[in-house]
Design a protein with these regions (language model features):
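Soluble "head" domains of membrane/secretory-pathway proteins
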Residues: 1-31, 35, 39-204
């Protein structure tokens, strides 16, 4: 049985048919890759230290140079079927206020802390509470947590929005400064580190 490409190219002479076969194959492959990036999985580079120690921006002492930063994959499809969950690392477009507060905006990667309608509180020791219950944040570096202990505050998360924070709290410009993130701004869930080779792993 002939496939779609065979049916298109059958009337052509041999040499031309081979050329058209290759062109059609490349076009289909490119279209498939673009569709996957748009709707299923997309790669991102970690440009800062705001998610240390979970996601690295560079080798120790090297600064956040592009060739050393973690590259991650985000599942763009999952949130079409369910809502984001607390503790997930999420890729999202920042609200406009982020540019004013942080000097930068665009696409950020942070951890989801507060869900719609909840109240998030950070005490003077860097502990987080959601609706009065302390979060178990084993993913934090204790030393970095102590560095952030001088920034207590309380924030209410509006309906339809999500409160995002970096794991490296003292070096993270996040929802504490520019507010919660609307549901429509959320792009996807980070599920894996794919570069550099020694850092390849899945993220729960």
């Amino acid at each position: 049985m002939r496939g779609p490409i065979d049916r298109i190219t059958a009337p052509l002479p041999g040499a031309w048919r081979t050329t058209v076969d290759w062109v059609l194959t490349i076009v289909i492959a490119v279209a498939a890759v673009l569709a996957i990036k748009q709707w299923v999985v997309n790669p991102y580079r970690i440009p800062s230290s705001s998610m240390e120690p979970t996601l690295h921006c560079a080798r120790p002492g090297a600064g956040c140079e592009a060739r050393y930063s973690d590259r991650v994959l985000a599942n763009r499809f999952i949130y079409h079927f369910r809502d984001p969950r607390r503790g997930e690392i999420i890729v999202f477009d920042t609200p406009p206020k982020a540019v004013q507060q942080c000097g930068a905006g665009g696409t950020f990667v942070k951890r989801l802390i507060g869900l719609p309608g909840e109240t998030v509180r950070e005490d003077d020791r860097g502990n987080l509470y959601v609706d009065g219950k302390q979060l178990d944040e084993r993913y934090l570096d204790p030393e970095r947590k102590r560095e952030d202990s001088g920034n207590p505050g309380t924030w209410h998360v509006p309906q339809g929005e999500y409160f995002m924070m970096g794991d490296n709290r003292a070096q993270s410009c996040d929802s504490r400064r520019w507010g919660a993130v609307p549901r429509d701004n959320i792009i996807g869930k980070v599920f894996a580190i794919y570069w550099p080779p020694q850092r390849i792993s899945f993220i729960r």
